[in-house]
């Protein structure tokens, strides 16, 4: 099954007494398939994390729909919602925020067993748990009896991925998950995401880093002020960018595309609300031009 967004928007009430409106995401549509890495790339405030949180049901869209398979996730409750979370999980930029600091790692995994696998025996659960930890490069004896503050950021990220694997997920929302990690750990986590793809999982990779998006993703969406300005197969978006904003972003990373240096500046670009609709440049490549 695939994850699909159709004309999704998110507007917040802001200002005194909520009289103002701020549109964080505007009319966004795309589909993430199992077995592919799909990158959302944009600067701070582009709406990429808001999209990830809506997919995880942490936020509700103001308009549009998000479907998993044929089901609108807004309609899910109780058992159906629990099953959705068996298939779709998220890992965020700050791994410490996902843990209760007073619980050791084994207690955190124990709660996952109680919630999702109460019928599994203790011995079988330990076998599954150890296999999941080892599959993400962790030694169970080194991490299970430690508190979150005793583990590194990279270890905590891997624990979250191991928990997701225990649930037998089909999609992972990875929101800026390597931005706080050192260089060697970043490589390890990127390799882990590539391994998840090889297992047939879909990964929504949310990042502001064009180099990482280019390196890891099969398809790419470029966001500006909550709207899609360009979308398609990564090699086409990066190899032949059509929207001036995409060209400007690539020009800021010379090792990606030094040829996109025509002098376009952010202040020269139209506001996203004035963008024309996306048109298909060629098969697998759309841009708002």
For every predicted segment, state its role:
Residues 147-151, 155:
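Conserved ABC ATPase signature
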Residues 213-215:
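A short, surface-exposed alpha-helical micro-motif characterized by mixed small hydrophobic
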Residues 41-43:
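The feature captures the beta-strand-to-loop junction immediately N-terminal to the Walker
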